[in-house]
Amino acid sequence: MAMRAKDALGRFGEEVASRHLAAGGAAILDRNWRCREGELDLVLRDGADLVFCEVKTRSGTRFGSAAEAVVGRKAARIRRLAARWLAEHPHAPSSVRFDVVLVSRPPVGPVRVEHLRGAF
């Protein structure tokens, strides 16, 4: 089955984000972790922090910025999923952080990556 363009763009963004975070010293613990309530894009360790990272990828501004997509219900859902992940992976981190990585892939020009630490 062919991958939909939206799914392919999302996978591209997650790969770019993973490489960006790893280059900054983070250790990727989980990618696309799923349970019946949903999916966490990335779970990583950044120093002493356990980080739950939502990746948003856009090819334009038609649907607003990627940062605007992670508010309210979406942020609350990610927090619930993080609690579920922690229940299944008792790491006892010293701190937990919620980040967003914004990947912009314009039709022309280079890919841009913006890492919002402690976004919500």
UniProtKB/Swiss-Prot annotation:
The residue range of the signal peptide is: none
Question: What sections of the protein cross the membrane?
Answer: none
> Which GO MF terms are attached to this record?
nucleic acid binding
Q: Which PANTHER family match?
A: UPF0102 PROTEIN YRAN
Family per record: Belongs to the UPF0102 family.
* NCBIfam families assigned: PRK12497.1-3 (NF009150), PRK12497.3-3 (NF009154), YraN family protein (TIGR00252)
Q: Under what name is this protein listed?
A: UPF0102 protein FRAAL5785
Task: Name the species this protein comes from.
Answer: Frankia alni (strain DSM 45986 / CECT 9034 / ACN14a)
